[in-house]
């Protein structure tokens, strides 16, 4: 993870994206927005469930690639933003 606000879970299967998100959230301040990049379709549901269980807020999910840009491995990447609450 090069940007402290980005959790790059592209190419990983669940539950790995949630594990990485939880690790990043552990040291983040209240109100921090983390962006999770993922390719596993189950990640969207799992991120939402994780956020609800911990009182965080999912701000939205959108395509990660620019329109017309082909995904590197053939799987479209998405990004979900989560605002942390303590």
Where are these regions (language model features)?
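Domain-level signature for proteins that mediate thiol-based redox and metal-cofactor handling
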Residues: 1-86
């Amino acid at each position: 993870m090069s940007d402290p606000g980005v959790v790059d879970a592209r190419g990983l299967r669940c539950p790995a994206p949630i594990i990485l998100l939880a690790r990043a959230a552990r040291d983040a301040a209240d109100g921090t927005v983390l962006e999770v990049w993922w390719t596993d379709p189950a990640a969207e549901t799992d991120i939402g469930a994780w956020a609800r269980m911990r009182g965080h807020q999912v701000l939205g999910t959108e395509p990660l690639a620019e329109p017309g840009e082909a995904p590197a491995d053939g799987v479209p990447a998405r990004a979900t933003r989560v605002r942390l609450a303590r």
